[in-house]
Each structure stands twice: as structure tokens, then as C-alpha cells.
Amino acid sequence: MLNIFCLICICLNSTLYSSSFFFAKLPEAYAFFNPIIDVMPIIPVLFFLLAFVWQAAVSFR
């Protein structure tokens, strides 16, 4: 349990304190991927919502 907590803390610290993480831009050769990359963080939320819709369709068995 403590090891998992330490790993989560390390990951959070590395993402929160690296300023290049939030402001990084793609190279010009890959600029056409920008719209796809803007949508990618939403995809896991859609799968989460799909699970509820699926359970509602089968009446929460």
C-alpha cells in the first residue's frame, strides 16, 4: 500500500512541477494531429459513461 502511494506521489510531482508537460507543443510535421490530441483525454470518460449506459440497457443485473 505504501509503495503504491509513493509511486502515485512521484508521478504527480513529476507532472505538476514540469512546466514543459502542460505547455509542450508538437513539432510542425505533426501539427495536423492537434485536433485528435485535444480530444484524446476525453476518451476514457466516454468509456466510463458507456459502462453505465450498458448496465442500464441490461437493467443493472
From Swiss-Prot:
The reply to whether Plastid figures as a keyword in the UniProt entry is yes
Enumerate the UniProt keywords alphabetically.
Answer: Chloroplast, Membrane, Photosynthesis, Photosystem II, Plastid, Reaction center, Thylakoid, Transmembrane, Transmembrane helix
Record's Pfam families? Answer: PsbK
The protein's location, in the record's own words, is: Plastid, Chloroplast thylakoid membrane
Which parts of this protein are propeptide?
Answer: 1-24
In the bilayer, the protein is annotated as:
Single-pass membrane protein
Query: Would the keyword Ribonucleoprotein turn up in this protein's UniProt record?
Result: no
InterPro entries, alphabetized: PSII_PsbK (IPR003687), PSII_PsbK_sf (IPR037270)
Q: Name one GO biological process term.
A: photosynthesis
Any Gene Ontology CC annotation: chloroplast thylakoid membrane
Transmembrane stretches, start-end:
32-52
Q: Which family does it belong to?
A: Belongs to the PsbK family.
Q: Describe the subunit structure.
A: PSII is composed of 1 copy each of membrane proteins PsbA, PsbB, PsbC, PsbD, PsbE, PsbF, PsbH, PsbI, PsbJ, PsbK, PsbL, PsbM, PsbT, PsbX, PsbY, PsbZ, Psb30/Ycf12, at least 3 peripheral proteins of the oxygen-evolving complex and a large number of cofactors. It forms dimeric complexes.
Q: What does this protein do?
A: One of the components of the core complex of photosystem II (PSII). PSII is a light-driven water:plastoquinone oxidoreductase that uses light energy to abstract electrons from H(2)O, generating O(2) and a proton gradient subsequently used for ATP formation. It consists of a core antenna complex that captures photons, and an electron transfer chain that converts photonic excitation into a charge separation.
Q: What is this protein called?
A: Photosystem II reaction center protein K
Task: Tell me the organism.
Answer: Phalaenopsis aphrodite subsp. formosana
Kindly list the organism's lineage. Answer: Eukaryota, Viridiplantae, Streptophyta, Embryophyta, Tracheophyta
Task: Tell me the gene name.
Answer: psbK
